[in-house]
């Protein structure tokens, strides 16, 4: 498929040096800078462009007669013939171009001179505008570089001042007061640095289980204390203290009850 397209384009688009310059007026009015088609294409497309090279698989007898065209260009190298499709619309496009006429045989006409002068004036104006644009761009670049240098100077001065200043000392640890500490976090350090033990808040489930255990046995063994501590997520010290307090309360209640009963019995004694 690719070879089909390449072979079909070979005859239609000749090489860069052989490519004809499209001219709508008299061929004698063409400027010197546009006589060489290779230089025209290189100037139009920039950076050494020599046109489209699709000469792969070209035969000696192309659509345009490449051999005859090369000989005609060698004979009249100083002229630039016009393309037959514009100069002779009646002839076929597949026929070879006619032989070019010498420059001396063609008399310059005032119209062609004016056309040539218009082209030169256009070329001069375009060159002047290009020069003005380049100078404007260069001036803008100069302003940009100057502003960049001015911006770099304060930045460098700021860096130097930052390096000269001593680095600030790391902030000290904030002071923690006793009322800022959280309670009931760990049961291992209940006393704390100040020596005051925190009050333990028992849940309803823990209180109910401890009351049941106290109802069956007022004194716990070490093994039973460890089991209750694991079951209620408490420490052995907390279990021990709770049972001590509960026994003291029980004794107080019993003492008051016995004293009240004794007082009541002595009052009713005959």
From Swiss-Prot:
Gene Ontology BP annotations: anterior/posterior pattern specification
Where is it mainly found? nucleus
InterPro entries with a match to the protein in the record: Antp_homeobox, HD, HD_metazoa, Homeobox_antennapedia, Homeobox_Antennapedia_CS, Homeobox_CS, Homeodomain-like_sf
One GO CC annotation, please?
Answer: nucleus
Q: Where in the cell is it found?
A: Nucleus
Q: Kindly state the subunit structure of this protein.
A: Forms a DNA-binding heterodimer with transcription factor PBX1.
Q: Which family does it belong to?
A: Belongs to the Antp homeobox family.
Descriptive protein name: Homeobox protein Hox-A5
Its ancestry begins with:
Eukaryota, Metazoa, Chordata, Craniata, Vertebrata
- The gene that this protein is the product of is HOXA5
